């Protein structure tokens, strides 16, 4: 049995887990990713800064529901990587591709763990795809996981 693939969903994907809206493009794929993780077909790990970015967006987009939605995500108890594991690589990605540290942190973690960052941010993907280890949510499929276990 091969090890489970490591996926690093960024904030754009995590928000689709809790924002129940028709406007959330590719929400079905984000939910499929979550279900694969819950079924044990993959591992999910996040940079320890994830909740700052998610909390900020929830507080701005859904102030009345922000606490409740954040608690849903916290209750998943997703594995978190300490900053020392991804900081240097994130800074390299920032410099090379002119992206934010927040976005680069997810990507750097995917690189250091030999996994894949999954993002719904097409702009980030276009800028950084040459670095590898990043996939746009729209193209992600759980079929790639089922063949590995």
State where each predicted segment sits:
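Acidic catalytic patch
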Residues: 68-96
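Short, well-structured N-terminal submotif of metal-dependent ribonuclease cores
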Residues: 1-46, 58-68, 140-148
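Short glycine/serine- and small hydrophobic-enriched flexible loop segments
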Residues: 56-60, 111-112
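Short, conserved alpha-helical segments within structured domains
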Residues: 46-50, 86, 106
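Short beta-strand scaffold positions
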Residues: 9, 45-46, 101-104, 119
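A general alpha-helix detector
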Residues: 13-14, 53-57, 72, 89
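Acidic, PIN/NYN-like endoribonuclease modules and their adjacent C-terminal/linker elements
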Residues: 1-6, 51, 76-80, 107-149
């Amino acid at each position: 049995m091969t090890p489970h693939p490591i996926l690093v969903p960024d904030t754009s994907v995590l928000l689709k887990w809790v924002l129940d809206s028709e406007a959330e493009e590719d929400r079905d794929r984000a939910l499929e990713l979550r279900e694969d993780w819950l079924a044990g077909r993959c591992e999910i790990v996040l940079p320890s800064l994830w909740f700052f970015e998610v909390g900020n967006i929830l507080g701005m987009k859904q102030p009345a529901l922000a606490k409740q939605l954040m608690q849903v995500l916290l209750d998943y108890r997703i594995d978190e990587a300490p900053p020392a594991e991804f900081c240097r690589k994130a800074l390299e990605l920032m410099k090379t591709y002119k992206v934010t540290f927040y976005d680069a942190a997810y990507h750097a973690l995917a690189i250091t763990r030999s996994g894949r960052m999954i993002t719904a941010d097409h702009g980030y993907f276009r800028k950084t795809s040459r670095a590898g280890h990043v996939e746009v949510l729209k193209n992600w499929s759980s079929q790639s996981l089922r063949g590995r276990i």
